[in-house]
Regions:
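The feature encodes the CheY-like receiver
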Residues: 62
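A Lys-centered signature of the CheY-like receiver
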Residues: 103
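Acidic, metal-coordinating helix/loop segments flanking the phosphotransfer/catalytic sites
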Residues: 36-54
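Hydrophobic/aromatic residues positioned on beta-strands within the core alpha/beta folds
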Residues: 81-83
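Conserved acidic carboxylate
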Residues: 13
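Active-site residues of response regulator receiver
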Residues: 58
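Non-catalytic signal-transmission and effector/linker regions of two-component phosphorelay proteins
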Residues: 1-8, 42, 106-120
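Two-component/phosphorelay signaling modules centered on CheY-like receiver
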Residues: 16-35
Length: 120
């Protein structure tokens, strides 16, 4: 099984239970969750200063889109992937080529998307 020892992750997810499940999956994959953020304003701030190898972004944070965070991460050359329960068709043109995890997902799906994201 592929794992990602020492990979530092920023998790942006507004549903507490889902965030905890994702954190567990990331830990099983030997990643370190450096920050877990639920609100867009805080995520925007954290994205500008956090030292991570990868970010996982829930597309919809309590009715607000996470795309400002994605723009900051892209400008900082930090790879990211989106997670959503709405499908990838709602992504703006600028992010259509980004990896997307469709909720609900299994650990094997997360492993595959992390590998894909880190390779790109």
């Amino acid at each position: 099984m592929t794992t990602f020892p020492g990979t530092r992750v920023l998790l942006v997810e507004d549903e507490g239970t889902i965030a905890m499940l994702i954190e567990e999956m990331l830990e099983d994959l030997e990643c370190t969750v450096v920050a877990s953020v639920a609100q867009l304003a805080k995520a925007i701030h954290v994205a500008g200063v956090v030292d991570v190898d990868l970010a996982m972004l829930d597309v919809n944070l309590a009715g607000e889109y996470v795309f400002p965070v994605a723009r900051i991460l892209r400008a900082r050359h930090i790879p990211f992937l989106f997670s959503t329960g709405y499908g990838g068709s709602g992504l703006p043109e600028a992010f259509r080529g980004c990896p997307v995890l469709h909720k609900p997902f299994a650990e094997k799906d997360l492993r595959l998307k992390i590998a894909l994201t880190l390779e790109s």
